[in-house]
Design a protein with these regions (language model features):
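Glycine-rich phosphate/adenosyl-contacting loop at the front of the ribokinase-like
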Residues: 1-101, 110-114
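Cofactor-binding loop segments of dinucleotide-utilizing enzymes, especially the Rossmann-like FAD-
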Residues: 9-11, 104-108, 131, 144-146, ...
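Anion (oxyanion) recognition and catalysis
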Residues: 91, 120, 202-206
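Hydrophobic beta-strand scaffold residues
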Residues: 100, 126, 211-213
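Active-site-proximal loop->helix
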Residues: 109-122, 142-148, 156
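A glycine-rich helix N-cap at a beta->alpha junction
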Residues: 118-135
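Conserved phosphate-binding/catalytic loop of the ribokinase/pfkB sugar-kinase fold
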Residues: 130-131, 140-191
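Conserved beta-alpha-beta core of the PfkB/ribokinase-like small-molecule kinase fold
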Residues: 181-236
C-alpha cells in the first residue's frame, strides 16, 4: 500500500510546567519586562533564558526559577511545541496511510535521551532527528498563574534554545523535500531554519510538495522590531 510521506521540521523540546506562580507578586515584578523585547518576563509571551539573564543579571536555573516556583519541581514534563506534537497526532490518526518523519535536533545530554525514549513510543520516523554534540536539549519552563486576569489564568514562557541554535538548513537532506507534505512549525525556536524559511519553502514547492507553516512566538524578531509584525522568511 502506498503511503503519503509527511515531513516536518521545527523545534522539539521538553515542556516543564510550573503551576501556582504568582504574576502579581513583588518577586515576579522584579523580572517583569519594562519595554517590548527587552528580555524580561511578560504574561502570555516568551523570552529566551539568556535574554532574561542579561535583563536581570541573575541566573535563571540558579536563582530566578527557584524563587518564582518556591523551589517546587515541575508539575508536568512533556514533549512540547507545535511541530513534533502535530506530527505525532498525524502519525496516530493516519498511520495506515502515511509515513510521518521529523527533522530536528537534540543535545547529547540526559534530557535528550529521555526525550528520544518518549518519541520512540510514537509512530514517528526519527531517522533524521540529529544529535548536536556539546549542546543541551531545548526546553521551555512554562510558568502558570491560574488566578491572573481575574481568574482567566495565563502562562509565561522561558525558552532554553540549546541545540536548536546550531541546526542549519544545509543539514536537511533531499528526503525532506521529496515529501508530499512539508510542515514548517515553530521554526522561530530554531533560528537558522527560520532565517532560511523562504529558500526551504521554495525548494519544497519546486518538488511539488504541499507546504504548511505554523507559527510560534518569535522573540528574536520581537526584540529586533518590537513595533513591527514578525516577518516570515526573507521575502516577507
Amino acid at each position: 500500500m502506498y503511503k503519503v510521506r509527511i515531513s516536518g521540521i521545527g523545534c522539539c523540546l521538553v515542556d516543564r510546567i510550573y503551576d501556582r506562580v504568582d504574576f502579581q507578586s513583588e518577586l515576579f515584578g522584579k523580572y517583569l519586562s519594562k519595554k517590548a523585547g527587552d528580555g524580561g518576563l511578560e504574561p502570555g509571551k516568551l523570552t529566551f533564558e539568556e535574554e532574561l539573564e542579561h535583563f536581570s543579571g541573575d541566573g535563571f536555573l540558579a536563582k530566578i526559577l527557584p524563587q518564582l516556583t518556591e523551589g517546587r519541581d515541575p508539575q508536568i514534563e512533556s514533549i512540547g511545541v507545535p511541530c513534533v506534537v502535530a506530527l505525532i497526532n498525524a502519525a496516530q490518526l493516519a498511520w495506515r496511510e502515511s509515513e510521518v518523519c521529523f527533522y530536528g535536533c537534540r543535545g547529547d545530554d540526559g534530557v535528550g535521551e529521555d526525550l528520544l525514549q518518549k518519541l520512540q513510543q510514537t509512530n514517528l520516523d526519527l531517522s533524521h532527528y540529529r544529535i548536536q554534540e556539546g549542546s543541551e536539549t531545548a526546553s521551555t519552563s512554562v510558568l502558570s498563574d491560574p488566578n491572573f486576569d481575574n481568574g482567566h489564568g495565563e502562562r509565561t514562557f522561558v525558552n532554553t534554545i540549546g541545540a536548536s541554535w546550531h541546526y542549519l538548513p544545509e543539514e536537511v537532506d533531499a528526503s525532506f523535500y521529496d515529501s508530499e507534505i512539508c510542515v514548517f512549525s515553530g521554526t522561530a525556536l530554531v533560528p537558522r531554519i527560520h532565517q532560511g524559511l523562504s529558500t526551504m519553502l521554495r525548494k519544497a514547492k519546486e518538488h511539488g510538495s504541499i507546504t504548511i507553516v505554523n507559527t510560534v512566538y518569535d522573540f528574536l524578531n520581537q526584540k529586533k522590531n518590537p513595533e513591527q509584525r514578525w516577518p516570515m522568511g526573507d521575502c516577507d
